[in-house]
């Protein structure tokens, strides 16, 4: 029997009898003495045994390979090369679904990932490589792996699919990410640096550059921190796939890399101070436009900011919320902005605190915290009732303290008897009745009219909005599942006519949670041509669609925010093409027939018949509205249709069951008027009749107002442009006057013209100078945090305007320069906290990406969210890569940059061992009869196992198997869990080179 055969038999028996790592080490040592074998043949025998077994994942196999590496039988580079030879990463698309059951190979990716991660650990601890030659060999092996994964991506990429290529397989994503981390770790070792810095390995660097060029574009979708790390590596060593000119000063490059490591290690962190301005800015950012409130992200940020200091957390978030209200009053913010600020304080914070108390089981002296927070407020902004009669100024916030305290008492944070003591006078109201979500759901199910009563209370300041919204959204989800569209229509109508209620909804729910079931219902709407009455169906469809459109346009939501994941979605097609007319020859036979039927019904027959609607589903009708308008208006403009007939026909669209379609009609009409080179009199008359109808029913009037709210802003811009081209026209102003009350519908964080003019004409450098001036005033205010004084004027719209108009690449350097000056002036810790908060503050453009880091979507079911702009965090990461160069010219700036980078990472660090608390769920299911609820009363989504089909028994068995495997390898599996960030791993890899004491070896759980 030959050596490979003997070894193959040995490996087969070891796997069959589940021989642990220690015994395997001893047995393999004995066999090696009797039957020597080359390392390549040894690995071939082991991996061929795996192929023959056809087992998708065997935890012993990586342990055996690791054992062979530790005992010096095989080299790491040879392991990686042999692993690739037998990997199923080479499988073609038609074989990918079989995962080795029918093909020549078994599915190997889970084993591949584990072996590569073991290699990463070995590299990070300094165990590998020992020589430059081994480092070169590992680099070449990584290069081959990267090309193999890139090839897999190309062969599985389908431009028509949201999730294709590597994103179509979680295992390939994990393999891809592990390779990048391994490359970064190897490049940070002493031997890795020597290889990359030497001029004798140009061939390797050319190939490495080619591999990075293939890797980095794909990395954007997987991990931005990893992409930034490898991009910095590419720039430092000029790894672009081309040979470096001979004149390059390589020794200087080598010194720069060593200096980079030494400089960053030499930067000492100062004291961490949580400035008063920090949370003031953060809450302003959450609420200044579309409410960007995610409980998981907020808890994580607060936990990172305050650690276990719950008293400070409660006191400072309360103080900041009152400060935001005070600032809004002094800045004369709009009533809708003041309403959002107020609702966050009164409706959000009390149940948020109650849920936090219930979930942490920590005793917090709430009355003391509230008392301290109230003592720090400006008494002129929040006067008592006795003071308000003496004051001549604005007393709009005089009852806010009382509302908040009663909401706290309703949630059992404080006893009702404490309210008078905290107010310093007798309260002017009584304790409101506390609501429970489940009870409200039962009430609505028993009496659907109860839903509208509750929706009316969403805007009340009694601390009950969270329970109401939880109940309403749950009922809506149930109605969508049951297709009970009549009751759902009434709820949607009640919500869509109350824009401020939509704002409160987003304080407690993200848009996808509310809208995804509605969009799914609209997409799958069942249409039966024999169902009887059709007008009620159009009515129900239109009401549901109108609520989706109201959310979409009020908050400028993208399809991903609505929960739309399919390119075939009706809602997506309507949003993209609903206001675009089609040429007749582009319509299919059914569309032509439907168009003819609707034209006949509107302009020839005496009304819209059941026959017309039965032949055309609501989905088909909405997609034809723009074409219907186009053809009808063209007929009128060419004299084929009288204007009065045209006007009378279009007035049918003012009926409630068709009114939502007017959104797309008005949008098309505005575009048509704006594009016209001829006299626009006829379309302007039509527009006036639809915007300001002579008669409209009471029911339709509410829907019409919502329609105008949605369409008004775009129409106004188009009409003003037309008026500029035709200054003598008198038929435009009446339309603009009718649109005027609807222009403030959007809530997207955009700046007012007067604000922008003030900032951009700032005497000290325009918009950037005004941002720096605001920064200075916030730092100055924070130097005396206990003083009862009004906060400095601030709106996060200023920073948003800077990022949107100038770009983050210009805003961040200005912030860093100001931070540097404040550091020189002795205000470094305060300024550092403020700058870090500005960078961490949520933005609408990046919010879904940030949410995905806390609650990842399944890439197999929906597309991963994307960020459309370069953020302050992105620029900070890129600037951090240039610290070595900056330190040579401006050491203080480099130090400030390093500290800022660390502080931002600390504030945004993902939770490691803290469960992901679904605070909304806790809030809704808590009994308001007492704070001391047990854990059994709360539904905590601690692990998300249920969402992935893993039951408690399965999870326990998996953990036991991993623990056993780890114990066999002599490792501790208590690990940090799967929440460890890539930066943590990369930083550990950097620090561990020659410094094993910096590396946490308890990493088993990561893999």
From Swiss-Prot:
GO biological process, one term: regulation of transcription by RNA polymerase II
Keywords for this protein: Activator, Nucleus, Transcription, Transcription regulation
GO molecular-function term, one example from the UniProt record: transcription coregulator activity
Protein origin, superkingdom: Eukaryota
InterPro entries, per the entry: Mediator_Med5_fun
CC terms in the record's Gene Ontology section: mediator complex
Primary localisation category: nucleus
Cellular localisation: Nucleus
Entry's family note: Belongs to the Mediator complex subunit 5 family.
Function according to Swiss-Prot or TrEMBL: Component of the Mediator complex, a coactivator involved in the regulated transcription of nearly all RNA polymerase II-dependent genes. Mediator functions as a bridge to convey information from gene-specific regulatory proteins to the basal RNA polymerase II transcription machinery. Mediator is recruited to promoters by direct interactions with regulatory proteins and serves as a scaffold for the assembly of a functional preinitiation complex with RNA polymerase II and the general transcription factors.
Assembly with partners or alone: Component of the Mediator complex.
The protein, known as: Mediator of RNA polymerase II transcription subunit 5
